[in-house]
C-alpha cells in the first residue's frame, strides 16, 4: 500500500546481460532486498508467471527475474511479453542489463575455469562476441545498464542496494561517475565528458599520490578560469537536458567525467557536479578508477 492507502504497482526487474557480468550476484542482492526472485525463468513461462503474481493480490509486489541466453527461445517470447507489459498499469517493468569489457569477461572465465555457454568448445572470447551480438537488441531496450568491469561482488551488491532499496525508490537518479581514459570509457555511460584539457595536479609532486577528494587537489582543479567556464557551460547544458531524459522514462542517467587516470581532475569535477544537482535530483557519485592510481603510489 502507498501512503494514501492505494495499491502500489508491482515492481518487476528483469536481470539479463553478458554471461560472467554478475547476474548471480545481482539476483542474490535482490533477494536480500526482499524481492521474490527466480533464476533462469524460460521466457515462454513469463506470461503465466506474471498471472500468478497478479493473482497474489500484491503479496508479490517486488519481483526480480534472471533471463538469459540459456533459453534459445529468449528473444521472440521475451519481446512479445515486454510489449504486453508496457500496456499494463498494475506492473512497472525494468530491464537491468549487466555488461563488462571483453577482457574482464575472459579473465573471469579463466579464473573460474568455466566454458562459455554459447561456445563450450571454443575459447571464451568467441562465445562472448557471439553473445554480445545476440544481446544487442535487449541491451537497447534496457532502462538500466551496469558496467561491472573492475567491480568486486561487494561493490555490485552495494550499487544494487543504492538503486533498488525501499529508501532509494524515488524515481530518476543522476549517476555521476569519474573515470580514467587509460582504462577505457565506461560502457554504461549515457553522456561522456573529457576534462583532460584542464591543468593536471598529477604534475605537482606532492599532489600526485592524492585524489580529487582531497581539498587541496579539488581547490587546485577548480581555481582555474577554464575550469569555471567549463562548469558554467556544462551545468547549464545538463540542467536543460535532465528534465527531458526524465520525461523519457529513464530511471537513471549516467554522466561520465574522464581525465587521464581517473584520480584527480575527473574526481574533483564529478563531486562538484553531483553536489550541484543534489538539491533537485537523487544523485549518486562514484569513482571507477580512483584507487588504481592511488594504490600505485603506496
Curated annotation (Swiss-Prot):
SUPFAM superfamilies: P-loop containing nucleoside triphosphate hydrolases. Keywords: ATP-binding, GTP-binding, Nucleotide-binding. GTP binds at residues 68-71. NCBIfam families: PRK05416.1 (NF003828). PANTHER family: RNASE ADAPTER PROTEIN RAPZ (PTHR30448:SF0). Belongs to the RapZ-like family. Displays ATPase and GTPase activities. This is Nucleotide-binding protein GTNG_3015. It comes from Geobacillus thermodenitrificans (strain NG80-2).
Amino acid at each position: 500500500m502507498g501512503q494514501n492507502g492505494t495499491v502500489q504497482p508491482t515492481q518487476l526487474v528483469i536481470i539479463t546481460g553478458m554471461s560472467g557480468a554478475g547476474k548471480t550476484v545481482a539476483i542474490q542482492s535482490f533477494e536480500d532486498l526482499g524481492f521474490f526472485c527466480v533464476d533462469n525463468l524460460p521466457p515462454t513461462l513469463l506470461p503465466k508467471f506474471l498471472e500468478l503474481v497478479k493473482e497474489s493480490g500484491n503479496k508479490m509486489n517486488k519481483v526480480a527475474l534472471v533471463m538469459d541466453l540459456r533459453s534459445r527461445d529468449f528473444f521472440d517470447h521475451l519481446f512479445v511479453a515486454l510489449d504486453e507489459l508496457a500496456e499494463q498499469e498494475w506492473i512497472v517493468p525494468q530491464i537491468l542489463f549487466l555488461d563488462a569489457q571483453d577482457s574482464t569477461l575472459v579473465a573471469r572465465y579463466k579464473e573460474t575455469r568455466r566454458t562459455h555457454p554459447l561456445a563450450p568448445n571454443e575459447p571464451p572470447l568467441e562465445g562472448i562476441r557471439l553473445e554480445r551480438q545476440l544481446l544487442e537488441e535487449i541491451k537497447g531496450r534496457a532502462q538500466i545498464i551496469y558496467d561491472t568491469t573492475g567491480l568486486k561482488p561487494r561493490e555490485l551488491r552495494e550499487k544494487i542496494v543504492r538503486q533498488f532499496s525501499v529508501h532509494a525508490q524515488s524515481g530518476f537518479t543522476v549517476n555521476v561517475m569519474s573515470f580514467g581514459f587509460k582504462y577505457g570509457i565506461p560502457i554504461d555511460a549515457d553522456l561522456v565528458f573529457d576534462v583532460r584539457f584542464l591543468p593536471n595536479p598529477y604534475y605537482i609532486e606532492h599532489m600526485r599520490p592524492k585524489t580529487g577528494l582531497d581539498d587541496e587537489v579539488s581547490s587546485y582543479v577548480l581555481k582555474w578560469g577554464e575550469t569555471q567556464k567549463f562548469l558554467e557551460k556544462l551545468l547549464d547544458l545538463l540542467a536543460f537536458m535532465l528534465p527531458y531524459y526524465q520525461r523519457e522514462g529513464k530511471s537513471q542517467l549516467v554522466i561520465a567525467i574522464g581525465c587521464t587516470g581517473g584520480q584527480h581532475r575527473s574526481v574533483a569535477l564529478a563531486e562538484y557536479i553531483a553536489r550541484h544537482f543534489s538539491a533537485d535530483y537523487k544523485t549518486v557519485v562514484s569513482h571507477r578508477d580512483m584507487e588504481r592510481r592511488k594504490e600505485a603510489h603506496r
